[in-house]
């Protein structure tokens, strides 16, 4: 078994001082900055961008549509 550099193997949570262990918006144990593209635009859809507060990549809207639709 290898030890994950970001995750405490006992608690299964990020180690002290680390913010995340995995995800498209997590890099080197830290959440990437707001606006970082985590899924490039395709067709009529906009880029998906990191929020700066989560390691998940939230879906962005279709071009011209508000994000709460």
Swiss-Prot record:
Main location (coarse class): secreted
Cellular component, GO annotation: extracellular region
GO molecular function: toxin activity
Its job: Potently inhibits adhesion of alpha-4/beta-1 (ITGA4/ITGB1) and alpha-9/beta-1 (ITGA9/ITGB1) integrins to VCAM1, and adhesion of alpha-5/beta-1 (ITGA5/ITGB1) integrin to fibronectin. Has a much less effect on alpha-IIb/beta-3 (ITGA2B/ITGB3) integrin. Also potently inhibits neutrophil migration across TNF-alpha-activated human umbilical endothelial cells.
Domain Disintegrin: 1-65
UniProt short sequence motif Cell attachment site, positions renumbered to this chain: 42-44
Protein name: Disintegrin EC6 subunit beta
SUPFAM superfamilies from the UniProt entry: Blood coagulation inhibitor (disintegrin)
Taxonomic classification: Eukaryota, Metazoa, Chordata, Craniata, Vertebrata
Note: The disintegrin belongs to the dimeric disintegrin subfamily.
């Amino acid at each position: 078994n290898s030890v994950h550099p970001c995750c405490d193997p006992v608690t299964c949570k990020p180690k002290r001082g680390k913010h995340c262990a995995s995800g498209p918006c997590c890099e080197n144990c830290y959440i990437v900055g707001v606006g970082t593209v985590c899924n490039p635009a395709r067709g009529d859809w906009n880029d998906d961008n990191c929020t700066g507060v989560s390691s998940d990549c939230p879906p962005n809207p279709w071009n011209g549509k508000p994000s709460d639709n």
